[in-house]
Every structure is written in structure tokens, then in C-alpha cells.
């Protein structure tokens, strides 16, 4: 018997919220990556790690917000806590690998393709590990074509996100790139969801065990949401993260070209020109002594010298 699968139990609330979570994580991750490229090598690894955590948590939060709208009419659904945590770790780690590769090696074709492939496969793995963490009275079956399509979407979205992380500058371009990332990652999630069917059985080969959505998913979403909030506060209080490279460069140029003048500095004294007669009889200090000869002798009150 095939179960009645509904991926939109709460209407458009869950897909819109999922998109916002993915876009938020992408936006914060992009800003942190921009900051790492202009803050020197001392804190570069820290900024890249913070950006990877933001993007990974955003993707994972998007996935499980979408899962809240998933239901099967004929059976209850529960979630395996360890597998759910594994899916979160996979999301953060694979995004971190991609971000660090492009952060240190740039976006050359080979580097970008390799990092995008690793990250995309990791995001797809996160999705299907999260799906497997569900327990219900039945078995899952997947449409192979849609599964392959969802993986391709994940790889393309990850490659585009990594390229944008080290290329896009400015607040509005980053906002647009984050929106595209949110659409792509959310589209990957719902493509993977549409690939799944549930075959119910009376023997309960996948008996519902673990925690329900309210007892497992909602508390587990708290941690990633707090992390996104912390990263958002950091971004708000660092104008270089918000404004991007242009403002950063402008600030450096202004600082390099600005030299404060001393207050109340007295003007340098200017020597008055000496009278011609005095110049004739009393040469300037440092001037060569006149040669000894008739032209160098002159009369004064003491006689001719």
C-alpha cells in the first residue's frame, strides 16, 4: 500500500521560511568570506570558518524547516537524533572544505569545480541522511532520475555559492547572490522530496521510533538559529562586512592619504633680505672669503685694509 505523501502540510509557510533560512545563511557566509579576504592572514581562517558555519547551518536549517511540512497521512513520523546530528555535521564540514579551498586557492576552473563537487555532494548527502533519519511504518522508495537531478542542483548551487563567496562585492550584489543561493538550495530540497514515495506495510519494518517533530526538530533548530543570530550581530557591528570591498578600499585610501596637521604650528621664520651695502661689506655667513688682492681691499674709518 502506498502512503499519501504531503510535502506542504502547512502550505507555503514552510517553503518560504526554508528559503529565508538558506538565504540568510548564504548572506552571512558571503559577508564573512569577504571579510577574510581583506583582514590579513592572521584571522583569515577564523573568518572562513565562521562563514562556513553560517552557510552550513543555513542549509541544514532550511532542510529541517522544510521537513516540518512533510507528512504521510497513514502513519506518524519520528526522527532519529544521532542521524539528525550527523546530517548537521556533514553540512558544516563539507561547506567548510569548499570555503577553505576557494578562500586560499582562489576560483580557478579546476579549483572551483573540485570544491563545488565536494560541497554539492556533501549537501546532497546531508539531505538524504536527514531523510533516512525519519522513522515510520513503511519503506521509502526513490525515483532515480529525480535523485540525480537533485544532486546536480546541489553541485551547481554549491559551485555558484563558492564562486560568489570570493567574487561578489558590495551589499546589494551579495544580497542578490544570497537570494539565488536560497532558491537553488531550497529547490534541491524539494526536488529530493518529490523523488520519494512511501510504501506502507503492516509488519512495521520501519517502526516509528525516536522523537517527534516537536520534541526533536524544534529543540535541535535552536542551536543553528542562535549561531546565525550571533553571526548576524557580528556583521551588523562591522561595517566592512556590510559594505564590502569598495568601502574597505576607500577607507584604506582615506587613511593612507590623510595626515593630521599639528595644531597651532608656528610658521617657519623667513629671513629678510640684507641691504645691498651690508651685503657688500659684510658677506653672508658661509660665503667664500674674497681673494687677497686690490679688489678685495676697501677703505673704512681705520684706513685702507
Predicted features along the sequence, with ranges:
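Peripheral, non-catalytic segments of secretory and membrane proteins
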Residues: 1-305
Amino acid at each position: 500500500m502506498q502512503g499519501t505523501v504531503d510535502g506542504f502540510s502547512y502550505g507555503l509557510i514552510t517553503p518560504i521560511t526554508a528559503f529565508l533560512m538558506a538565504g540568510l545563511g548564504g548572506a552571512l557566509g558571503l559577508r564573512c568570506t569577504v571579510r577574510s579576504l581583506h583582514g590579513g592572514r592572521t584571522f583569515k581562517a577564523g573568518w572562513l570558518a565562521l562563514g562556513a558555519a553560517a552557510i552550513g547551518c543555513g542549509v541544514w536549517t532550511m532542510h529541517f524547516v522544510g521537513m516540518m511540512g512533510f507528512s504521510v497521512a497513514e502513519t506518524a513520523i519520528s526522527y532519529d537524533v544521532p542521524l539528525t546530528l550527523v546530517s548537521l555535521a556533514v553540512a558544516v564540514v563539507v561547506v567548510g572544505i569548499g570555503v577553505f579551498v576557494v578562500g586560499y586557492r582562489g576560483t580557478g576552473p579546476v579549483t572551483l569545480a573540485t570544491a563545488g563537487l565536494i560541497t554539492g555532494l556533501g549537501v546532497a548527502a546531508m539531505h538524504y541522511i536527514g531523510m533516512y533519519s525519519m522513522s515510520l511504518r513503511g519503506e521509502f522508495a526513490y525515483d532515480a532520475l529525480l535523485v540525480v537531478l537533485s544532486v546536480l542542483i546541489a553541485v551547481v548551487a554549491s559551485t555558484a555559492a563558492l564562486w560568489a563567496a570570493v567574487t561578489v562585492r558590495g551589499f546589494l550584489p551579495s544580497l542578490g547572490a544570497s537570494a539565488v543561493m536560497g532558491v537553488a538550495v531550497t529547490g534541491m530540497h524539494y526536488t529530493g522530496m518529490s523523488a520519494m514515495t512511501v510504501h506502507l506495510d503492516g509488519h512495521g519494518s520501519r517502526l516509528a521510533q525516536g522523537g517527534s517533530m516537536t520534541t526533536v526538530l524544534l529543540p535541535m533548530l535552536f542551536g543553528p538559529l542562535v549561531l546565525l543570530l550571533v553571526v548576524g550581530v557580528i556583521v551588523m557591528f562591522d561595517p566592512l562586512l556590510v559594505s564590502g570591498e569598495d568601502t574597505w578600499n576607500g577607507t584604506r585610501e582615506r587613511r593612507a592619504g590623510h595626515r593630521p596637521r599639528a595644531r597651532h604650528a608656528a610658521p617657519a621664520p623667513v629671513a629678510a633680505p640684507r641691504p645691498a651695502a651690508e651685503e657688500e661689506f659684510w658677506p653672508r655667513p658661509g660665503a667664500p672669503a674674497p681673494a687677497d688682492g686690490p679688489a678685495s681691499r676697501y677703505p673704512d674709518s681705520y684706513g685702507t685694509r
